Amino acid sequence: MENVRAYGAGLAGANFDKNTFFKKPTVLFRCAALLFGLILWYSVSKGGWHKPSDAIHPVCLYGRSSSTCSFATAVGFFAVCGAIVLIVLDAKMDQISSVPTRRRAVLADLVVSAIFTAIFLIGFFTFWSKLSAFEVDEDDENPIKTNNAKFGILSALLSFLAWGGAAFFAWRRYEEGNQATHEPNYDEHFGQVSTDVQDGYGYGGDSTGIGHVGAPPPQSSYQSGAAPQTMQQPPSNPYTQSEGYGY
């Protein structure tokens, strides 16, 4: 019973429904993050550099900092890899029967999404400020094309929104999973029943329900000189007229 809808996934071993899977908000956000990561990687690697007419090597359009362009391409590449891994992990979630393993998977999803959200937020402002600070030499004869660099900035912003949305839904799934797994189950409810009810009395009055527990109640004695024994009445039974274990 604990595996049913544990941490946003259904019963372990359930059939995979791709139509339902690709309609999930987390999957949609990760697909968007994958696409924007590809755009960032391609835009910066192909159009984030400029070769001045008097230089041998090209310079990065983001403030002439080669490390910034390398950082942008690396972030785009790892964002694509991370989105693919998390999509596959979400697709395999229904096959995981262990609730603690599901908890660790959702927690890893939350941590990775939050890290990429912070990285893209920092990267967006960094790329924007450094592209604005790029200055062209007056004697440079080669025209500068900044369209790809600007697409890189836009894709960094959109990646921030996509990973932020994925992190939000991962956090919601983690919180809902914690609440579901910490709710008292039937055994805990049964353990809270007072001992005078457990000893000698069954729920429902017969074998229906949980069944007869202990020995039958003592019969009243009518021998001469002996006071009649009174049978203690059990408290009201919330499981009366219930079948099985009430699940």
UniProtKB/Swiss-Prot annotation:
Domain spans labelled MARVEL: 21-175
Chain segments carrying region Disordered: 206-247
InterPro entries for the chain: Marvel, Synaptogyrin
Domain of life: Eukaryota
UniProt KW Disulfide bond keyword: no
Keywords: Membrane, Transmembrane, Transmembrane helix
Subcellular localization, as worded in the UniProt entry: Membrane
GO cellular component: cytoplasmic vesicle; neuromuscular junction; synaptic vesicle; synaptic vesicle membrane
Protein topology in the membrane: Multi-pass membrane protein
Tissues in which the UniProt entry reports expression: Expressed in a wide variety of neurons and is expressed weakly in the non-neuronal distal tip cells. A punctate pattern was observed in the ventral and dorsal nerve cords and the nerve ring. Weak expression is seen in neuronal cell bodies and commissures.
Single GO BP term: synaptic vesicle transport
Record's keyword annotation contains Transmembrane helix: yes
Entry similarity comment: Belongs to the synaptogyrin family.
Protein name: Synaptogyrin homolog 1
Species whose genome carries this gene: Caenorhabditis elegans
